[in-house]
UniProtKB/Swiss-Prot annotation:
InterPro entries: Ribosomal_Su5_D2-typ_SF (IPR020568), Ribosomal_uS5 (IPR000851), Ribosomal_uS5_bac-type (IPR005712), Ribosomal_uS5_C (IPR005324), Ribosomal_uS5_N (IPR013810), Ribosomal_uS5_N_CS (IPR018192), Ribsml_uS5_D2-typ_fold_subgr (IPR014721)
Protein name stated in the entry: Small ribosomal subunit protein uS5
S-S pairs: none
Family: Belongs to the universal ribosomal protein uS5 family.
Record remark: domains: The N-terminal domain interacts with the head of the 30S subunit; the C-terminal domain interacts with the body and contacts protein S4. The interaction surface between S4 and S5 is involved in control of translational fidelity.
Function recorded in the entry: With S4 and S12 plays an important role in translational accuracy.
Subunit relationships: Part of the 30S ribosomal subunit. Contacts proteins S4 and S8.
Start and end residues of each S5 DRBM domain: 17-80
PANTHER family referenced in this protein's UniProt entry, alphabetically: MITOCHONDRIAL RIBOSOMAL PROTEIN S5
Alphabetical keyword list: Ribonucleoprotein, Ribosomal protein, RNA-binding, rRNA-binding
One Gene Ontology term from the biological process aspect of the record: translation
């Protein structure tokens, strides 16, 4: 049963970018004639080789909301620097009142993270990391804070280049 569920939530496209559903919310708009139901989907996309992004989509049907979220996620992909199977250094990502602390871990230790952070790390291809979620725990805030933390990562070469003034 786990395999069937994985294949449903994790699809592979021809451009080698996978997507994984994080959350689906039912949204209700109250109008004169009653309630109008819509769905909002949060999807994380990535190639498991250092590129990751997230997207949101809203529609009257769940599959259409997921499709819109995947398109949105592909537009907003970022490159994540990696050192082997982990991240180069410790970092804190912020979004709203949600904070995510990401720490590098030794090879083979795995991803010690909650649901939404684990999905982002899996889609980015990071297999060894430790994280702590602080503040808001809603999936959208956690995903945005995690992506913010990944944007802040720098390799040692990038840091050295910034520290060294160019010589004329």
């Amino acid at each position: 049963m786990a395999n069937r569920n994985d294949s449903r939530n994790n699809r592979r496209n021809k451009d080698d970018i996978e997507d994984q559903l994080v959350a689906v919310n039912r949204i209700t708009k109250v109008v004169k004639g009653g309630r109008r139901m819509r769905f909002a989907a949060l999807v994380v996309v990535g190639d498991k080789k250092g590129r990751v992004g997230f997207g949101t989509g809203k529609a009257q049907e769940v599959p259409e909301a997921i499709r819109k979220a995947v398109e949105d996620g592909k537009k907003k992909m970022i490159n994540v620097p990696k050192v082997g199977t982990t991240i180069p250094h410790e970092v804190i990502g912020h979004y709203g009142s949600g904070n995510i602390l990401l720490k590098p871990a030794e090879a083979g230790s795995g991803v010690a993270a909650g649901g939404a952070v684990r999905i982002v790390m899996d889609m980015a291809g990071i297999s060894d990391v430790t994280s702590k979620s602080l503040g808001s725990n809603t999936p959208i805030n956690v995903v945005r804070a995690t992506i913010d933390g990944l944007k802040k990562l720098r390799t040692s070469e990038e840091v050295n280049k910034l520290r060294q003034p160019e010589r004329a």
